[in-house]
């Protein structure tokens, strides 16, 4: 069994979701198989063994406090929000009112963006466009980024058997009727 840092496991999980078109964007059905921006990032870290959802992270507005309680540090003053300089793989970038993404390195981020209709809910399950959840170049968000959070327990590892397939959710709130 391979050992992987929690940072790498969170990034790998988010990338697997972005690269699997059975997962799309939806704010109503957001805990799998579809995700919105915050549930994607929260789920990636929860799957990596960092209990951010358990500690109360549920949307962009309360992510920061839950992530800080789980070993993240606010490194906003150490990075350039306009260019992305100083960011590291796994950094969580947040605008507390609107959006969140994860920095994956080399000037790239993984993000859940919008559904196939250009809306936040009401689309079909899965990624219809290949752009609902995707990897893209880092950008300075139109409303500005509020903070960058970095997981500082980098020596913490977790066993993994497969870095790709996320577990299916059994939460009833995720089932479309």
Kindly give the residue locations of the regions a language model identified.
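Low-complexity, Gly/Ser/Thr/Pro-rich intrinsically disordered linker/tail segments
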Residues: 134-177
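Residue-level preference for short coil/turn positions at secondary-structure junctions
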Residues: 88-89, 105
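N-terminal capping segments
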Residues: 1-58, 64-65, 75-76, 88, ...
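Catalytic Cys-His active-site segments of thiol-dependent hydrolases/isopeptidases
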Residues: 54, 102-136
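Short, well-ordered loop/turn sites that connect or cap secondary structure elements
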Residues: 81, 85-88
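Surface-exposed intrinsically disordered loops and tails
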Residues: 65, 69-80, 120-139
């Amino acid at each position: 069994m391979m050992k992987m840092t929690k940072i790498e496991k969170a990034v790998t999980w988010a990338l697997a979701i972005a690269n699997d078109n059975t997962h799309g964007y939806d704010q109503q059905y957001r805990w799998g198989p579809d995700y919105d921006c915050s549930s994607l990032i929260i789920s990636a870290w929860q799957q990596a063994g960092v209990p951010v959802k358990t500690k109360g992270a549920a949307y962009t507005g309360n992510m920061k406090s839950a992530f800080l309680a789980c070993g993240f540090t606010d490194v906003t003053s150490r990075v350039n929000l306009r260019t992305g300089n100083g960011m590291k793989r796994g950094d969580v970038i947040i605008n507390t009112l609107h959006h969140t993404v994860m920095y994956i390195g080399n000037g790239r981020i993984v993000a859940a963006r919008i559904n196939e209709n250009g809306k936040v809910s009401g689309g079909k399950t899965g990624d219809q466009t290949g752009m609902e959840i995707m990897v893209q170049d880092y950008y300075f968000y139109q409303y500005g980024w509020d903070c960058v959070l970095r997981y500082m327990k980098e020596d913490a590892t977790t066993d993994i058997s497969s870095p790709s397939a996320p577990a299916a959710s059994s939460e009833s709130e995720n089932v479309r009727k």
